[in-house]
Amino acid sequence: MSPMKVDPALVQMFAENVRAEVMAPVSSFKLEPAIIEKIKKKVPIFSGMSSDRLMRTLAVAEYCSVKAGELVFNERDIGDSFFVLMSGEVLVEKLRNGKAVTLARLNAGHCFGEMALVGNHVRSATVRVTRDVVAMRFYRDLIDANPESAQVIYRNIACILASRLGESSELLADLVGQSAAT
């Protein structure tokens, strides 16, 4: 995965009508209020963040592109960052008995890699790109250096993980139920 500067056209794929240089200094990083509101609504990890705080958070992101077929990271890699998809699609996979099992298919607005921020820094799954990706990468130290943003992001990570745990519990109950019936 290679860091890249993103021109306004790429940012526009993520949020319509953006007219900003995303790599500009925080003080000059500006987005239209309607775009900020759209990002807060469509990207759960930023939900509840003030507009000013969101602009500051977006300004510290590293913008990355990854081609279809490539891996973003492998299960058991050490992680210190999470990603927000701007465009493209990834599969989240775990290896079981030597075979990749797909856990989720994620697209624009979804985040991944967040468990490394709240857990033991070890990636819990492999993330494989199925359609060329442009993503924002946020490093733990930059998030933690900004307590107001960190509080909102970690709260939203907790909500996202709780939702995923609920979905996993339902699947597990279904599997156990099917097993008991046979």
Language-model features: where?
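Cytosolic regulatory regions built on CNB/CRP/Popeye-like sensor folds
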Residues: 1-182
